[in-house]
Curated annotation (Swiss-Prot):
Protein family membership: Belongs to the aspartate/ornithine carbamoyltransferase superfamily. OTCase family.
Protein name per UniProt: Ornithine carbamoyltransferase, mitochondrial
GO terms classed as biological process: arginine biosynthetic process via ornithine; citrulline biosynthetic process; L-arginine biosynthetic process
Biochemical pathway: Amino-acid biosynthesis; L-arginine biosynthesis; L-arginine from L-ornithine and carbamoyl phosphate: step 1/3
Sample GO molecular function, one term: ornithine carbamoyltransferase activity
Entry keyword set: Amino-acid biosynthesis, Arginine biosynthesis, Mitochondrion, Transferase, Transit peptide
Length: 349
């Protein structure tokens, strides 16, 4: 039988329905994204009060979640394993020494075999094509825990963090299922345009949050990602706007939140000297925020790991910094996503 004619075996006469995957925030409607954030917030409050929501108790009992990580990880691994265990499931970690995607066997073979033995695949990979191919041939939900292009779990955690700090200040908070009460907020991204930014900007557009991006010339958001961000405006009553500049001070003007990330991602080590030179004027400092005219109560975020050239100690360890709650929120984001895509089979409510 030709490979493209293969169908998963079932005890019946027909193949199972195609599972729903989470590969990018672009896969979600505004209401679905807002619901994932709200659920994460609710579960965080309940579980940290030494209680477990009834809908999560044993929700993954008897289920195995395969964690296929071809890239090293700290927060993603700990948050995902912790989420699975809290929900009563079994996390199975498959690192790069256990499995090499597309090396010893095709991605097709890997996806078909592993998905026949587990209830979900959480994958942290390199090229987006790897996660897309895993999902294409998987018989169970695939959740993107990071690829070179997107990082949806980080975006959920980031908006949970922003929601906790700013939503109560908005008069529109909680008035519509597709709203997080953040309309009109401004995020300034200062640094490299990367996978974290891409999903953050898509989410912001859906939530009515404006994003101003400052990168050195030559490090801007790729045109095909800009198109995807603009597409996220469709069907949104008051979508957020995206602007780009090469001047950090321009980006941070009137910013509520200033965000940065590593300047040298995994796989870019050979570009270190070039990148350090290109980004030398993009360090987040109190002086930068003051020169640019950020709002008086601006907050700082960074998904970690952090390097001293990216942000000053003064900002990173200040009361403005949300980096440690942001990191913790990866756990609650993972719980929310696992419930939606594994327990509820893609129905987000």
């Amino acid at each position: 039988m030709a490979k493209n004619q293969w169908r998963p075996y079932t005890n019946g006469s027909h193949a199972p329905s195609t599972p729903r995957h989470l590969l990018s925030i672009a896969d979600l409607t505004p209401t679905e994204f807002a619901t994932l954030v709200r659920n994460a917030s609710s579960y965080k409050k309940t579980i940290k009060s030494d209680s477990m929501p009834e809908r999560l108790t044993g929700a993954l009992s008897g289920k195995t979640v395969a964690m296929m990580f071809s890239k090293r990880s700290t927060r993603t691994r700990v948050s995902t394993e912790g989420a699975v265990v809290k929900m009563g499931g079994h996390p199975m970690f498959l690192g790069k020494d256990d499995i090499q995607l597309g090396v010893n066997e095709s991605l097709y073979d890997t996806s078909v075999v592993i998905s026949s033995m587990v209830s979900c695949i959480v994958a942290r990979v390199g090229p987006h094509s790897d996660i897309a191919n895993l999902a294409k041939h998987s018989s169970v939900p695939v959740i993107n825990a990071l690829c070179d292009t997107f990082h949806p779990l980080q975006a959920i955690a980031d908006f949970l963090t922003i929601h906790e700090s700013f939503a109560s200040q908005s008069a529109t908070h909680g008035t519509h299922p597709s709203s997080l009460g953040l309309e009109g907020l401004k995020i300034a991204w200062v640094g490299d345009a990367n996978n974290v930014l891409f999903d953050l900007a898509i989410a912001a557009t859906k939530m009515g949050v404006n994003v101003a991006v400052a990168t050195p010339r030559g490090y801007e958001i790729p045109s095909h990602i800009v198109e995807l961000i603009q597409k996220a405006r469709e069907g949104v009553q008051s979508p957020g706007n995206l602007t780009q500049t090469t001047v950090p001070e321009v980006a941070v003007k009137d910013a509520d939140v200033i965000v940065t990330d590593t300047w040298i991602s995994m796989g870019q080590e050979t570009e270190k000297i070039k990148r350090l030179e290109a980004f030398k004027d993009f360090k987040v400092t109190s002086e930068l925020a003051k020169r640019g005219g950020a709002k008086e109560n601006w907050k700082f975020m960074h998904c970690l790991p952090r390097h001293p050239e990216e942000v000053s100690d003064e900002v990173f360890y200040s009361e403005r910094s949300l980096v440690f709650p942001e990191a913790e929120n990866r756990l609650w984001a993972a719980i929310s996503a696992l419930e939606a895509f594994v327990v509820n089979k893609g129905k987000i409510a």
